[in-house]
């Protein structure tokens, strides 16, 4: 019988670790020859080490994917590191299958890790039973009735931004170059502060002091914006053992999380105290002792409702986790989409004029949600913006078991055989190509890459099976994990466009080809000739009417 001495243990442990590493590396190196995806059509790898990674990291929009999809069909194989095959499909039946089986297809651990750096452990990151509980409790706060109540905030803050730009443009003779993204980001931050927590960021106030919560989120966004261009962060996200190695990113994000935690706990304590005071004083109506329409108050109310069993309620930590989720999802995505909307309108002055004519027919400056939703061309412009410029361009899922994914469009393998399913192994990642589906010529026609709001007057039959929660688009995903706040975002965006396009004319300030985009959590605009200035969207803003 063999026995180990104290001297042998380190050697045995090292040998075991080496054998385990050799096994894992061997499996990875064999995947190009053993993966069930190897028979799928797709582009050749540019190199054995990088596969198609370098090509994809260098692309600014969906042009390269579109080229490949036209050549290889809606379901294809891409090559990751070491030529490992990766599934890529815009097949509507396949996406519907994966999105509707969210338990079997959760987010990969590395994606959840990256999102936690920005969003915390909130609804977007939660999986399984916790996600279902959070969703059930939070759903009422994002219903139509609640968004109707919040529309007043959307309009008031839109008008505040309008007045700031109006004064700025007036000082400069009625026309000025303005970085619209900066103002829109401040406006949507103010909105989510009030609508989300009844918290004043005062981001639009030019005399306001720097806000530490806003500064904390800028640090978190820095992490994600660097994720696509830093090989160290990519490798670190894939190998959890490397995350224990401290670096500048991890130190800054840890400090930022401390700030959000402290302020979040303070907000929750204030809401609970106010609700308790209301209950003790017997107040029944909202807005007497507390502006109870904000999302956090509604969440706390719902969580303490007698209709929710004790074992189904969220802990304070679970409620706290929603604070960064509300902030990021509630302001960065909407400001980004509105930025790209005005960019599109600056290129299509005919569309801008037609839209302004419709908006000018509304007899009030403070429209309700129902009045905004009753404007058909505004609705078409918003839909077309969300199609071409979705704030989040892709998602990802991972198979928790071996499976066969059904296809609407069969593919031919390398041996000439047709298949109407794709067989995948446990651990296979499944990208959700939001932008790819939204811009597919096979679904939307040859003009799929053009900004044409009129297309919404007669939507192609081919887009009907797209499994999105809203408007035959993948922008807000679909299934049990569809974006809970899509109504909030759409009405806020309509309020912004309504207010700004009635007051201003927008034109390009730089050549169209000088505008590029970089993808982090959202796709942010940059000016190629002014990259040192960071993200921006400069437009020429002109006064249209005297207010």
UniProtKB/Swiss-Prot annotation:
Q: Which residues cross the membrane?
A: 9-25
Q: Does the keyword Membrane apply?
A: yes
Q: Glycosylated at which positions? A: 336, 438
This entry carries the following GO cellular component terms, namely:
membrane
Care to name a GO molecular-function term for this sequence? oxidoreductase activity, acting on paired donors, with incorporation or reduction of molecular oxygen
Q: Please, which domain of life does this record's source organism belong to?
A: Eukaryota
- What InterPro entries does the annotation carry? Cyt_P450 (IPR001128), Cyt_P450_E_grp-IV (IPR002403), Cyt_P450_sf (IPR036396), Cytochrome_P450_monoxygenase (IPR050121)
EC number(s) recorded for this UniProt protein: 1.-.-.-
User: Which Gene3D superfamilies does this UniProt record tie to the protein?
Assistant: Cytochrome P450
Q: Where does heme bind?
A: 483
Pathway connected to this protein: Secondary metabolite biosynthesis
Which CDD domains is this protein grouped with? Answer: CYP_FUM15-like
What general EC class does the enzyme of this chain belong to? oxidoreductase
Q: Which cofactor does it need?
A: heme
SUPFAM superfamilies in the cross-refs: Cytochrome P450 (SSF48264)
What are the entry keywords? Glycoprotein, Heme, Iron, Membrane, Metal-binding, Monooxygenase, Oxidoreductase, Transmembrane, Transmembrane helix
UniProt KW Nucleus keyword: no
Membrane topology qualifier = Single-pass membrane protein
Q: Where does this one sit in the cell?
A: Membrane
Q: Mainly localized where?
A: membrane
**So what family is this one in?**
Belongs to the cytochrome P450 family.
Q: What does this protein do?
A: Cytochrome P450 monooxygenase that is able to use 7-ethoxycoumarin and testosterone as substrates for oxidation.
Q: Tell me what this protein is called.
A: Cytochrome P450 monooxygenase 128
Task: Provide the gene name from the record.
Answer: CYP128
